[in-house]
Amino acid sequence: MRTHFMKNQSVKRNQHVSTPAIPASICADGLISELVHNEDHPGMTQLLLLPLLQQLGTQSRWQLWLTSQQKLSRDWLLRSGLPLDKVMQSPYCGTITTVEAMIKALQTGNYSVVLGWLADEISETERKRLQQAAKSGQALGLIMRSECNVLPSARPLHGLRIQSSLYH
């Protein structure tokens, strides 16, 4: 994951963000969604993801980032308006898959959102297990996938495909 930030696109920590409240039913029912992003245009991903993460940051629960590469920057988190005291990052660990880590984290109910960066498609069985875990923990699970890892014919289930080239 890259933690680049768009120039002149910072959010003051105590500034009110005018994003609509997340319906309680989303967290109560649990939800798994997938965001396919273009790593060459991290600003677009941030524009879509940050309002959601800022809203979830108002909850008493943690946000868990299961990343495979870079460490989250404290400065980036501050500029993004995300609560430092509620964001946890766990880098990829070879003993457990990211999907298994997401399932375990979602089940605990300790996290409002669990973001997992996955390189490969997941099976329908894994998706069902993730959905059940999200429902059990009343949490949101976000599968983050780079579009270079997605086959042209593959489409994310319950997700959003970002065609960054259309916006630039």
Curated annotation (Swiss-Prot):
Domain of life: Bacteria
GO biological process, one term: DNA repair
Pfam families: SulA
The record's account of how the chain is modified after translation: Is rapidly cleaved and degraded by the Lon protease once DNA damage is repaired.
Region ranges (FtsZ binding): 105-111
Signal sequence bounds: none
Residues at the site labelled Essential for degradation by Lon protease: 168
Keywords attached to this entry: Cell cycle, Cell division, DNA damage, Septation, SOS response
Subunit structure: Interacts with FtsZ.
Described purpose of this protein according to its UniProt entry: Component of the SOS system and an inhibitor of cell division. Accumulation of SulA causes rapid cessation of cell division and the appearance of long, non-septate filaments. In the presence of GTP, binds a polymerization-competent form of FtsZ in a 1:1 ratio, thus inhibiting FtsZ polymerization and therefore preventing it from participating in the assembly of the Z ring. This mechanism prevents the premature segregation of damaged DNA to daughter cells during cell division.
NCBIfam families given in the database record: PRK10595.1, SOS_SulA_coli
Similarity comment text for this entry: Belongs to the SulA family.
Protein name in UniProt: Cell division inhibitor SulA
Gene field: sulA
